[in-house]
């Protein structure tokens, strides 16, 4: 299972809000919802997030085993 929990933690730690992601990073509100609900997000969007914040993919996404 894919989880964006690492990025949600990063957002809290760095005081990043929804409006910043939409307006400064350029992601859509639909993508923001997907990130919060651990739904699939396109790889080019994940790359955009990594490049904007200068963070490795491991700070955006993690894979958890399904139980």
Language-model regions, residue ranges each:
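A short, Lys/Arg-rich alpha-helix, primarily the initiator
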Residues: 1-20
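Alpha-helical residues within the helix-turn-helix
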Residues: 12, 23, 51
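Residues in the helix-turn-helix
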Residues: 20, 31, 59
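Recognition helix of helix-turn-helix/homeodomain-like DNA-binding domains
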Residues: 26-41
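Short, basic-rich loop-to-helix N-cap that marks the start of a DNA-contacting helix
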Residues: 39-51
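Short C-terminal boundary/hinge segments that cap the last helix of small helical domains
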Residues: 54-67
């Amino acid at each position: 299972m894919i989880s964006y929990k690492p990025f949600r933690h990063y957002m809290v730690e760095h005081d990043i809000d929804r409006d910043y992601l939409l307006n400064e990073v350029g992601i859509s509100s639909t993508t923001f919802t997907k990130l919060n609900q651990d739904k699939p997000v396109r790889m080019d969007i994940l790359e955009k997030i990594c490049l904007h914040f200068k963070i490795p993919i491991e700070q955006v996404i993690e894979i958890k085993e399904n139980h």
